[in-house]
């Protein structure tokens, strides 16, 4: 009998029942909530008179709509200028209070982006099923967890039953071998992968990232890669448990203690794919061949190495793809064969659930230390992923490095990743962003988003256009 993949093991542990239509009912260990996708779910519970099935399986925090300036964060929620944003944050507070859910409220130092604080607090643990009303819940798979986003109706279902109806996925292995050169990061790995297999390449798959390169990554780097598995079309991204996983979790507030910890670790060590496990698809990447990546279009698959040029649609033989390239270039205001390094930036954003952890801020600070943001850049901002990340960065003096260079040092939140709060691009503005999506209007109506790593974003802020961070730091 063939061995099992990590995904297969976690599925089998959590499958409650199989249904006649081929779907299954799976048990959910951890449910994370935020202010945008939860209000209707709570209202549904009230209307039906249903209690929560397991209150302590849920944690919550506001992140999408919270402002990131000190002026709007001081005092009560009344300081939030936008009425819709204020209402959503207030509603989350009220719902959590009414149903007894533990919430990191807006001005709690532990507040932050859901996919940053879950692991940070130890609320995400190896072997868990983790869901949240947000597609980038795949981030938590970095801990050997089965994690994915759900819709609002499913949020209500999990609150009421602690179970979810879903279809079992196929298995994909992405194997990355070799040593990354300095200045090439986890963000570049996942962008290179998406460039290779496309945004539909992972459709229907749970993706396990493996190989020597992945094992060498920090937990922060693994979270970055799993975060963007969704941009490759997969619903799930995961990495097998190893000593780095266990060390990261140890001592965190929600992590097991004492004998419970010992028992948990013994179980976690088995959360790896068996040597003879079968994968339905295997994709291989060589770390040495990966260079710093920059997206130039309106999809994460529209990506090139920094030393390359914008593609020419006339060289595309597929008429559908050709039309897509033409539309993207028009929206982005670029010409075929423009060098990536010729793209000038109006704004730079370092943050989001992809790249706002302490390792990301350290990498960016290393680049900007002793340098200044280019005068042509209208705004450069750093938004830590949580209050604890912000506090740690300030202990290390990173805030001073950024401020002296001309960056704005903000309060935690989703910020400019998406146009749901005051941090937005103006029409036609180009932004070097460490976020995960570059769709039309993602950061503001008419805004032009270029996805990069924190180091590349920092280098672009200093130069005023894209540059190879490896050259800048020589």
Curated annotation (Swiss-Prot):
Gene3D superfamilies (alphabetical): Aconitase, domain 3 (3.30.499.10)
**Record SUPFAM superfamilies:** Aconitase iron-sulfur domain
Oligomer status and interactors: Heterodimer of LeuC and LeuD.
What's the Enzyme Commission number for this chain? 4.2.1.33
Pathway where it operates: Amino-acid biosynthesis; L-leucine biosynthesis; L-leucine from 3-methyl-2-oxobutanoate: step 2/4
* Molecular functions (GO terms): 3-isopropylmalate dehydratase activity; 4 iron, 4 sulfur cluster binding; metal ion binding
Which CDD domains does UniProt cross-reference here? IPMI (cd01583)
Q: Which residues bind [4Fe-4S] cluster?
A: 353, 414, 417
Question: Any idea what this protein is called?
Answer: 3-isopropylmalate dehydratase large subunit
Q: Which gene encodes it?
A: leuC
The UniProt function text for this chain reads: Catalyzes the isomerization between 2-isopropylmalate and 3-isopropylmalate, via the formation of 2-isopropylmaleate.
> What's this protein's family per the entry?
Belongs to the aconitase/IPM isomerase family. LeuC type 1 subfamily.
Which cofactors are required for activity?
[4Fe-4S] cluster
Which UniProt key words apply to this protein?
Answer: 4Fe-4S, Amino-acid biosynthesis, Branched-chain amino acid biosynthesis, Iron, Iron-sulfur, Leucine biosynthesis, Lyase, Metal-binding
Give the record's GO biological process terms. Answer: L-leucine biosynthetic process
Catalytic activity annotated for this protein? Answer: (2R,3S)-3-isopropylmalate = (2S)-2-isopropylmalate
Which NCBIfam families does the record match to this protein? leuC (TIGR00170), PRK05478.1 (NF004016), PRK12466.1 (NF009116)
**One Pfam entry name:** Aconitase
Q: How is the cofactor bound?
A: Binds 1 [4Fe-4S] cluster per subunit.
